[in-house]
């Protein structure tokens, strides 16, 4: 029996990148529908700052992500500027039907 789930993501998030890279470990019977969102829109709606906007959280987040990536054998490098505006990347993914291949290419380019 096949199951499907919606996976909401933003290219700005290192956690989205790391989770996406683990999808190949999931059963083939699981259909993951990729749903791009603008994380900043959620943060703004709730009056919050993102972790990358708070220096101490940014440092801890990067350290944790590097540790997690190394532990799981996932290539990881922080983009030259973070936070950055992911809107063009999200629009590109949507224009190209948000396929796993497209999302993988964009994540690999950024992270």
Feature annotation, model-predicted:
Residues 2-14:
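Short active-site neighborhood of thiol/selenol oxidoreductases, capturing the structured segment around
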Residues 15-111:
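Structural alpha/beta surface segment adjacent to cysteine/selenocysteine redox centers
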């Amino acid at each position: 029996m096949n199951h499907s789930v919606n996976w909401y993501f933003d290219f700005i998030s290192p956690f989205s990148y790391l989770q996406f890279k683990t999808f190949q470990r999931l059963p083939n019977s699981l259909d993951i529908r990729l749903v791009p969102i603008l994380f900043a829109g959620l943060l703004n709606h709730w009056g919050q700052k993102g972790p990358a906007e708070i220096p101490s959280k940014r440092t801890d987040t990067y350290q944790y992500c590097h540790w997690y990536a190394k532990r799981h054998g996932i290539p990881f490098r922080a983009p030259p500027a973070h936070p950055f505006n992911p809107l063009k990347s999200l629009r590109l993914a949507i224009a190209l039907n948000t396929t796993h291949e497209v999302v993988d290419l964009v994540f690999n380019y950024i992270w």
